[in-house]
């Protein structure tokens, strides 16, 4: 019989290898086990939500992400997942809230944690640039684009945004 920790690692490996359906089953089993640690539960929720969203179950995925906030303070990855939901729906103010929180979120320091560095810098900055641009906040869009450029100076989207924003701001 697998321990809670082993269920988590197994689900994470399935997720990493893009075996969404199998990962979802294993992650659900892990989340039902009272033995799992809070940070692992929060990460499992994020992965399971991603699996659900990939299967076209966006509403179930976002509900799960929000429920997952009970386990641990949100990481940059968690904030970006929630921000992406609102971004895709064109709900710019809500997306801004989550992407700004991603920039200030604590990284998971648990040994073996998968930390996606882009969720603490480039990704929220480039998304914030677009969100503020969509709202007509050109100066904020410009500021976040330049911040994104600090993380990835040669990124094509940063250059394109720079050209676009030069005409707007």
What is each model feature region?
Residues 1, 35, 39, 73-74, ...:
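Short coil turns that delineate tetratricopeptide repeat
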Residues 5, 39-43, 76-78, 94, ...:
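Start-of-helix register in tetratricopeptide repeats
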Residues 20-21, 58, 92, 138:
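TPR-repeat structural position
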């Amino acid at each position: 019989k697998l321990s809670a920790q082993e269920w988590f690692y197994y689900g994470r490996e399935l997720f990493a290898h893009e075996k969404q359906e199998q990962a979802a089953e294993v992650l659900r089993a892990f989340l039902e086990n009272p033995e799992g640690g809070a940070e692992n539960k929060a990460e499992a929720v994020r992965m399971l939500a991603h699996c659900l969203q990939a299967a076209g179950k966006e509403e179930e995925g976002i509900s799960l992400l929000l429920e997952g906030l009970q386990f641990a303070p949100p990481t940059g990855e968690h904030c970006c997942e929630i921000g992406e939901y609102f971004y895709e729906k064109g709900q710019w103010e809500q997306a801004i809230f989550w992407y700004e929180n991603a920039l200030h979120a604590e990284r998971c320091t648990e040994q073996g944690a998968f930390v996606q560095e882009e969720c603490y810098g480039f990704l929220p900055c480039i998304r914030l640039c677009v969100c503020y641009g969509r709202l007509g906040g050109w100066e904020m869009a410009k500021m976040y684009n330049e911040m994104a450029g600090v993380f990835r100076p040669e990124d094509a989207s940063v250059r394109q945004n720079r050209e676009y924003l030069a005409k707007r701001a």
